[in-house]
């Protein structure tokens, strides 16, 4: 008999967002049966609106080694590992891979409950593309005009090359003074049209501003990402189904684009396996000319 369920993730905050709708489905099923459920990370409370454990994941010594989802018969507790990297090999970090992971978790729930808890995962991953919980947001400031958001934090996973594109962004800001360039990682610059999310969100007063970054991205014409945590939070359903949105990912392989294998994406999406600032600059200059100014020069 399962008396308690603890979701945990010892690695990435971005996974909290991409897992959110799956975790909610499981939470609803557990709540129907009166099973106590929580997420063993303090960030989960405001990032994905799920109950948070009284202990952080690192206060569970048996979880820090990143074990597979398992059932502890002594405490009747099911521990569910939600880190995609444990289940899926590299080059498969996307919503389709998340679907396969949660199907596997559903099988473990079925076994741990002696066949009593059946959770069906829909084959359409678009149904699980996450949305931002606007009622949980702290105040944000969004610059007026055309906005491009750069999720240029250094990724801690292997899905992308390291680099913050500072040189490329500075050149673009010089070329296009009428466009606002919003960046998640701070770097040296002298342009009035470069903004940093730390200054647009209430970052100093909250645990993390990833949900706010996702919210800001929905007001941007372009999203430029590298599969970092902030980039993951910009992969929202509103962005996916917006035909006026352009999403560019600089990642190692197509499998690391979140839209890979997802039907119904209306945004203009593209990916590139490059990392040097010159290539990033040239690609984005061409994209901006074509999508915002509607010319190819």
Where are these regions (language model features)?
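Catalytic machinery of carbohydrate-active enzymes
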Residues: 1-297
